[in-house]
Every structure is written in C-alpha cells, then in structure tokens.
C-alpha cells in the first residue's frame, strides 16, 4: 500500500468535509444550479470520484497525476458521502442540511471512510 497516497486521500476527505460543512452552515442557501437544475454535491462528488478514481486504479507508482487524483478522489468521496446521508435522512431542503441528523450522518460516513483506509493500511503492513 502507498501510505503517502492513503494519507493524502484521508486528508482531502476530512478537509473537504469540514470546509463544505463550514461554508454551508454560514450560507445554507448557496445552491449550484445548471440550466435551472440544482446540482447537489453528491453528483459533483461522484464526478470527482469517477474522474480521479480511474487514474488511481489504472496507473501504478507515484506521480503528480496520482497525487492530484488522490486529492480529487478524497474530496469527491467526502462530498458524496455527506450529501448521501443528508438526502436519505432529511427532506432534502437547504434548512434540513443544518439539522443534527444530517451532520451526525455525514460525520459517521466520512469517519467510516477514513477508518476503512486505516483498516486497509493495517491489513497491508508486512506485505510487499
């Protein structure tokens, strides 16, 4: 396992979650609309996961491309997991994003993702 890559993914995951939650708690009615359609950060996250996950899955080694892809993958994962819980547990309104159930769900899912990286790291120790 590339421990540096794991650290970058977890750092991007946690940083993106904290920044997104902070920004949207300050300005909860900030929406990203395209052609009259509200684009939730779940969809932005899925695009980042796809675009950045492919190079990570297909290219071995360490390069500037895999470093950037690691940041994008972690950021996309944070966006998708945070919004996923919010859309399941609430009515999807901007005000509901600020509810404790939404925050707790986001913390739980992002925490599970970071914990999963740690478990994979520990399981890979001693392997070539």
Regions found by a protein language model. Give the residues of each.
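N-terminal membrane topogenic signal
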Residues: 1-10
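Alpha-helical transmembrane segments of multi-pass membrane proteins
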Residues: 13-27, 53, 75-83
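Loop-to-helix transition at the N-terminal end of transmembrane alpha-helices
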Residues: 31-47
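Hydrophobic cores of alpha-helical transmembrane segments in multi-pass inner/ER membrane proteins
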Residues: 45-55, 107-120
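Cytoplasmic-side transmembrane-helix entry/capping segments in multi-pass membrane proteins
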Residues: 66-73
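Interfacial helix-loop-helix junctions of multi-pass membrane proteins
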Residues: 85-102
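Membrane-interface capping segments at transmembrane-helix boundaries
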Residues: 120-128
